[in-house]
Amino acid sequence: MKMPGILLYGFGPYDSHETNISGELVRSIQLPRNVSREVFDVKFDRAMFIDAIRRHGPAIIIGLGQSARSRKIRIERRAVNLMGERGKKKRPISRHGPDHLSMSLDVPHDDQARLSYDAGTYVCNFSMYVIAEHCRDSRRRCGFIHLPKRYDMRHAEAFVGKLVEQTLLSRNHWV
């Protein structure tokens, strides 16, 4: 068995946010060589996410996003089949897809983090749904974490670094 490759992704700035902690963390965190990185533009673009999976060929995909209102790390457990910007009409991500898809990667939580079953309907949720739908008939695992906008970068790096390390050490994710 070989150790799994991981794709860690985050996002660049959006709307009035000049920075995005998720993209900053993906760029700055020290990671093993079998972890690929992507920082995506904040846009509803299915092909952008699928192309990255095809390019990197990971067994595990960990997404990071920024939460402007949260004070704790949120471990997202499901993506809903809705997309849209705040104040605009929502529409389905996948015309014939299920109402929601569960994340297949178990992410441990502690006092720094809480479980969440509502990732909203913006691009983080969109990426989660598209990736989970793409991976559901494969052995790939995917998970998503929202980081508070004003969270301490050292603590965020420690949390994500520990998650990557635990994921790599867990035989449940080896292919």
Regions found by a protein language model. Name each.
Residues 1-121, 131-142, 148, 154-175:
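N-terminal catalytic or cofactor-binding beta/alpha core of small enzyme domains
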Residues 124:
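Short glycine/serine/threonine-rich phosphate/pyrophosphate-binding segments
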Residues 127-128:
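Active-site-adjacent betaalpha module
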